[in-house]
Amino acid sequence: MAAMSEDSCVNFKEMMFIDNTLYFIPEENGDLESDNFGRLHCTTAVIRNINDQVLFVDKRQPVFEDMTDIDQSASEPQTRLIIYMYKDSEVRGLAVTLSVKDSKMSTLSCKNKIISFEEMDPPENIDDIQSDLIFFQKRVPGHNKMEFESSLYEGHFLACQKEDDAFKLILKKKDENGDKSVMFTLTNLHQS
């Protein structure tokens, strides 16, 4: 077994108990990672539900619609999602935000478990391990699909649900019995 490099070790100068919890105080904390999300780079994509309907942001409300490629191109500011990837101090999936840009940037939020696009740029840094803006993009085993779990509401995923005569993007607790409403196809687009 190979020995660990000293560069990957942390030297401690002190240990202390506070409220029955043992804390280690490092000599230097400059190399320690904090619990946060740091924005890295972005890509653009079109998201489709299991019925091949395109995610369309209409007045900051996300809905799924049947669209031809020509319709999609004509509606590009509302169908072209900007997916920012974030560095995550924990391993829970690819941390991302989902945004669209028409005249202004809007970013998807799941505040209070309500899905909407808020007029804002995705933040450079989020000093927490949970956020209403961060979703964990994960590959669905056995499918060529993705799912997006909320970092704020563990076990809750973006999903497509029919309401009245529209298909809407919602946040819901995932049904463990092969729930296809949380599965999406991402088609990456060329950066312009």
From Swiss-Prot:
MF (Gene Ontology): cytokine activity; interleukin-18 receptor binding; receptor ligand activity
Compartments it resides in: Cytoplasm; Secreted
Keyword annotations of the record: Cytokine, Cytoplasm, Inflammatory response, Secreted
Record flagged with keyword Cytoplasm: yes
Pro-sequence residue ranges: 1-35
InterPro entries for the chain: IL-18, IL-1_fam, IL1/FGF
GO cellular component: cytoplasm; extracellular space
Modification(s) after translation: The pro-IL-18 precursor is processed by CASP1 to yield its mature, active form. The pro-IL-18 precursor is however not processed by Casp4/Casp11 in rodents. The pro-IL-18 precursor features autoinhibitory interactions between the propeptide and the post-cleavage-site region, preventing recognition by the IL18R1 receptor. Processing by CASP1 induces conformational changes to generate critical receptor-binding sites. The mature form is then secreted and released in the extracellular milieu by passing through the gasdermin-D (GSDMD) pore. In contrast, cleavage by CASP3 inactivates IL18.
GO biological process, any: positive regulation of inflammatory response
Site feature location: Cleavage: D35, N36, D69, I70
Annotated Pfam families: IL1
Quaternary structure note: Forms a ternary complex with ligand-binding receptor subunit IL18R1 and signaling receptor subunit IL18RAP at the plasma membrane. Mature IL18 first binds to IL18R1 forming a low affinity binary complex, which then interacts with IL18RAP to form a high affinity ternary complex that signals inside the cell. Interacts with cargo receptor TMED10; the interaction mediates the translocation from the cytoplasm into the ERGIC (endoplasmic reticulum-Golgi intermediate compartment) and thereby secretion.
Cited function: Pro-inflammatory cytokine primarily involved in epithelial barrier repair, polarized T-helper 1 (Th1) cell and natural killer (NK) cell immune responses. Upon binding to IL18R1 and IL18RAP, forms a signaling ternary complex which activates NF-kappa-B, triggering synthesis of inflammatory mediators. Synergizes with IL12/interleukin-12 to induce IFNG synthesis from T-helper 1 (Th1) cells and natural killer (NK) cells.
Family: Belongs to the IL-1 family.
Protein name: Interleukin-18
Organism listed in the record: Mus musculus
Source species taxonomy: Eukaryota, Metazoa, Chordata, Craniata, Vertebrata
Primary gene name: Il18
